[in-house]
């Protein structure tokens, strides 16, 4: 059985994927809360930390533009709009956790979880792509920032 956080990430992925799909199809009748609540109800007995799922979904939506801006230079040969929707969603989730939850979840765990989601839901090459982009993001955005802050001391 999947760990509680892993299952939470699956629910977040399903929610974000469906919400993006429906909004791009100009379905104005749906709200992200509606989609999230429906998905949480499906797994209600298995998910203990619903706040984690809600924070992840809301954070990715709130920071989507900034997350996309961070992904672009890391994967310049793949315009964000041309990355498969599932891969794009996994990248956004992973990057959000790397940037905003590194104090709660170790970066290597975040990357591994994203790779596992890509293996389960993406294409044959998704896991390698996700691993490469998030690994580069970790090295350039997180490690470099940490190195710069210690160098200034």
Q: Can you say where each PLM-predicted feature lies in the sequence?
A:
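N-terminal interaction/assembly modules
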Residues: 1-127, 131-153
């Amino acid at each position: 059985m999947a760990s509680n956080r892993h299952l939470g990430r699956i629910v977040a992925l399903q929610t974000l994927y469906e919400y993006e799909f429906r909004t791009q199809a100009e379905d104005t009748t749906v709200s992200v809360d509606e989609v999230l609540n429906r998905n949480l109800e499906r797994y209600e007995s298995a998910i203990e930390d619903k706040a984690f799922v809600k924070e992840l979904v809301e954070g990715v939506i709130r920071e989507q533009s900034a997350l996309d801006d961070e992904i672009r230079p890391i994967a310049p040969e793949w315009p964000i709009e041309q990355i498969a929707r599932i891969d794009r969603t996994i990248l956004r989730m992973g990057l959000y956790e790397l940037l905003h939850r590194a104090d709660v979840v170790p970066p290597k765990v975040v990357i591994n979880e994203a790779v596992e989601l890509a293996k389960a839901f993406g294409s044959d090459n998704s896991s390698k792509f996700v691993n490469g982009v998030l690994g580069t993001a970790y090295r350039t955005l997180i490690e470099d920032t940490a190195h710069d802050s210690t160098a200034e001391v």
